[in-house]
Amino acid sequence: MILNIITPEKVVLKEEVEEVIVPTVNGEIAILPNHVSLVTQIATGELIVKRGGKPYSIAIAGGFLEMQKNELSILANFAIRAEDIEVAKVEEAQRRAEKLMKEKTTDDDFRVAQAELIKAVLQLKVATK
């Protein structure tokens, strides 16, 4: 099946794959070639792609997926392949987010910092696998 992962910034991935394990708001689902048509909401988490019998990871946050005619299209708010993650930058982003969460901030500022922290922790998990 063909897997397309697209964010507002760029096409992250377009290739033929054997299996995709996707975090959804209802739990993880495995999608294989010729899967029934499907539309669902993606959760923040680790997306696992199997190609050539070997798995690799992508950090993904929010969005939707559509499976139709043996093509899986994922429109994500954020997605990055493990090999593209710059660990030092992500660790710095994590420290900044933790600092902002400890400071007296508005609820909106806290939620933004919390979302950044979750994204940083996810990227570190995927990058250090």
Task: Go through each PLM region and give its residues.
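Absolute protein N-terminus
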Residues: M1-I2, K129
